[in-house]
Amino acid sequence: TLYFGNNVDNHVHAHDTRTGKRKWSFAADGSVRFAPVIKEGWIYFGSDDGHIYCVDAAKGTQIWKYRPGPSGEHIIGNGRMVSLWPIRTGVLVENGVLYAAAGIFPYEGLYIVALNAKTGRPVWVNDTAGDQAWGLQYGGMAPQGYIVASSDTVYIPTGRSMPAAFDKRTGKFKR
């Protein structure tokens, strides 16, 4: 099965690789900009609607969803409604923990999260990351891109700037 997100129709699709036929589609309420992650029969991804989703890979049904941002506020971006705290990073799932980042405007707040991959419940949340990485005088940190990690650090991509590093166990900003 081939799984892919679509930033035009707001869906994650599953297609049979032999026939090309669609098995299922799951609709988010915003663009799905990054490839989903598949682990142990579940699919994880983020959306411009500000939610992180967990979907059953076989059925395409939602298992859980989590909103890192403080509210469901939306703005217009490129002619579409977008959360003030969209998920503009890929998600990373390691050892039963999902890592993601929400937000594009540092002055509105950014949210770096570690969630229990099975339940969607927070392991930790860093809600002070907006000006930590480079300071607001340099534009702050705006998470964009794929997250990577080492044994003790989660690296959040920040578009054109250097990635920001966070302690994998606590979420505390490192550098």
Regions found by a protein language model. Give the residues of each.
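Short secondary-structure boundary/capping segments
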Residues: 165, 170-173
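Hydrophobic or amphipathic alpha-helical targeting/insertion segments
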Residues: 42-66, 117
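Aromatic (tryptophan-biased) beta-strands that constitute blades/sheets of beta-rich domains
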Residues: 1-4, 10-13, 21-28, 61-81, ...
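Repeat-blade elements of multi-bladed beta-propeller folds
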Residues: 1-12, 26-52, 80-113, 136-163
